[in-house]
Amino acid sequence: MPAPLTLDGFRADLAEFLYQQPDEVDLEENPLYAGLDSLRIVTLIERWRETGADVSFIELAECTSFDQWWQLLSARQGGAGHVTA
């Protein structure tokens, strides 16, 4: 069973695609305004599915902040994603 996605891992994944440090990722920022295009979002979705978070592109596209993404992802892991380590 894959390790669940953590908030730290989520921030690190976003930072990689945004060319930032994980602590620079603003979770209140709109993903589309942050510069994530559809290809990058699909790549992230595939990565997160490997951790057990089953979300779709449409579900993420309806969210208006990275924090909403995190809430959806962590809920899809049965709450296991609330770990920060």
UniProtKB/Swiss-Prot annotation:
The modification O-(pantetheine 4'-phosphoryl)serine is found at residue 38. Pfam families: PP-binding (PF00550). Residues 1-77 form the Carrier domain. SUPFAM superfamilies: ACP-like. Its cofactor is pantetheine 4'-phosphate. Pathway: Lipid metabolism; fatty acid metabolism. The keyword Phosphoprotein applies. The keyword Transmembrane helix does not apply. Keywords: Fatty acid metabolism, Lipid metabolism, Phosphopantetheine, Phosphoprotein. GO terms for biological process: fatty acid metabolic process. InterPro entries: ACP-like_sf, PP-bd_ACP. Acyl-carrier protein (ACP) involved in the biosynthesis of a unique class of isonitrile lipopeptides (INLPs). Is the dedicated ACP for the loading of activated acyl groups catalyzed by ScoC. Belongs to the acyl carrier protein (ACP) family. This is Acyl carrier protein ScoB. It comes from Streptomyces coeruleorubidus.
